[in-house]
Amino acid sequence: MSLFRLYTRVLELLGKERRLGWTLAVANLLLATAQFAEPVLFGRIIDVMSGNLATGALVPETRSPWPLLAAWVGFGLFTILCSATVALHADRLAHRQRQAVLTSYFEHILQLPLTFHTGTHSGRLMKVMLQGTDALWRVWLGFFREHFAAILSLVVLLPLSLYINWRLAILLFALCGVFTVLTTLVVRKTYGMQNEVEAQYSDLSARASDALGNVALVQSYVRVDAEVQGLRFVADKLLAAQMPVLSWWALVTVITRASTTITVLAIFSLGIALNQQGLTSVGEIVMFVSFATLLIQRLEQVVSFVNSLMMEAPRLQEFITVLDAVPAVRDRPDAIDPGRLSGLVEFLDVSFSYDGKRPAIEDLSFTALPGQTIALVGATGAGKSTAIALLHRAFDPQSGVVKIDGMDVRGLTMSGLRRNIGVVFQEALLFNRSIAENLRVGKPDATDAELRLAAERAQALDFIDRNDLGFDTNAGERGRMLSGGERQRLSIARALLKDPPILILDEATSALDAVTEAKVNLALDEVMKGRTTFVIAHRLSTIRHATRILVFDNGKVIESGTFDELVAQRGRFAELARAQFMVQEEARAAVATATDDAPVRL
């Protein structure tokens, strides 16, 4: 993305603040015009006092300097008031819009598909959000407070200086042109280098976040020194990339200071020569020296602005790239909110591919009646999770239709559809908030009595009441203050509060010990009552009483039936069942043999 296009996008993000932005632009134009009145009046006052008539006619000739001085005071007061007003409103605009864009970005990334979040480090997304919005704030604030006025000053100065004395004006702009060319070369030189710097910043953030997210692993394997050394290595690469950029911008500082001195001396030299020929006045020479000083200052501001924009460009580009990421699915313009559904689910010849080449799901058809339990079985990558993802519209199928209560899910609003579907994940997902707040994710307006009832039905009330703070107990980051079984029972209580007609159990007990699994299964039996339930399972013992079992292989359903029917068919499912049960029988036999062979002690 070009720098100009990037900056256009930055201005587009002003949103509702555009009207204020235009008002500030007009105020900056007036400010830029008024600022040049001071050197003009200064020069005219000198001419009047020295009796040397000016060659220009910008100000009517007068023998008294007092009217000119009064005008100078008036323009000075106007400039002060206008500058203060612009600065105040520019500050407010930048702060308000930073918060608005931050909220918009946060809402946007929460709506992006899980595949995006799987492939993007959460630490990077946080860095992009915070650094991107801070960069927007700095650019907006600097632009409307001073940089836009500086740019307009250059536009105003050209015709004004040509009108007063075209000879001095040509010299002034020739010298400033050289300054601009040299600065532009430095800007182009450092643009790619700064992109490399920001890439190193992203690596640094991701590595630090990765280590902090696995701090238990780092400590248990005594990897603290190694991780610190790894971070130091990335930081050294960052510093190595940053130093050349800083050197080039130090050169810009030298060019700026040299340009100021050379320009003032050149104008004085030419002005003296012209004055000796009667082609300019002393006041005009002083006026153009003031112009030169003012122009160099404005060019410095413009260069500073371009410099800051160059420094911020990688952050802004990264921010806008995430902001431009398109959700895999969206609400159709004519989508409807279905209200509460009964739970009749139909897959009709559904096919889906992630890459457009190998099908993840192919010609899948089945019907789940309200209240039935449908189990999905198969090896990893067989298509179970993909089928469920199509149900709650993480993706849309390339062909076929997924229906609920006879309605194509693509015709329903996302919020309306997902309000009717509850999910109990394999790893219970909890916020770093109180237990009550985590449960109210399922039902924000739930009363305390409803929380207790849901926790009781989910076999969670006992451990909640054991805590001194009860429902106000903080779950910790990702629920780490609780055990795996406690987290899972809270997840089930949350689903009970949501009370959806359709429930998805994604390996809900696979990571639990036998005792905890028994408690969780009691809670699951409670939450499954009266709901259409889909169970993704590797432990076949957990789906013994499923209404129907679908056996997946390479995106297709190769077997379908009840547990007993599938075992009787002696197919793939029967092999899985025998393998799992044989492992359990062999384990029990080994324990029994060890017990029999052990010596008896009296």
Swiss-Prot record:
Occurrences of domain ABC transporter (ranges): 345-579
EC number: 7.5.2.3
PROSITE patterns tied to this protein: ABC_TM1F, ABC_TRANSPORTER_1, ABC_TRANSPORTER_2, NDVA
Pfam family, one: ABC_membrane
Endpoints of the signal sequence: none
One MF annotation (Gene Ontology) recorded for this entry: ABC-type oligopeptide transporter activity
GO CC, alphabetical: plasma membrane
Reactions the enzyme catalyzes: [(1->2)-beta-D-glucosyl](n)(in) + ATP + H2O = [(1->2)-beta-D-glucosyl](n)(out) + ADP + phosphate + H(+)
Keywords of this entry: ATP-binding, Cell inner membrane, Cell membrane, Membrane, Nucleotide-binding, Sugar transport, Translocase, Transmembrane, Transmembrane helix, Transport
Main location: membrane
Cited InterPro entries: AAA+_ATPase (IPR003593), ABC1_TM_dom (IPR011527), ABC1_TM_sf (IPR036640), ABC_transporter-like_ATP-bd (IPR003439), ABC_transporter-like_CS (IPR017871), P-loop_NTPase (IPR027417), Type_1_exporter (IPR039421)
Binding site for ATP: 378-385
Domain ABC transmembrane type-1, residue spans: 21-311
Transmembrane segments: 22-42, 68-88, 146-166, 167-187, 254-274, 276-296
Function noted in UniProt: Involved in beta-(1-->2)glucan export. Transmembrane domains (TMD) form a pore in the inner membrane and the ATP-binding domain (NBD) is responsible for energy generation.
Domain characteristics, as noted in the entry: In NdvA the ATP-binding domain (NBD) and the transmembrane domain (TMD) are fused.
Subunit-level organization: Homodimer.
Similarity comment text for this entry: Belongs to the ABC transporter superfamily. Beta-(1-->2)glucan exporter (TC 3.A.1.108.1) family.
Protein name (database record): Beta-(1-->2)glucan export ATP-binding/permease protein NdvA
Organism: Rhodopseudomonas palustris (strain BisB5)
Lineage of the organism: Bacteria, Pseudomonadati, Pseudomonadota, Alphaproteobacteria, Hyphomicrobiales
Gene (UniProt): ndvA
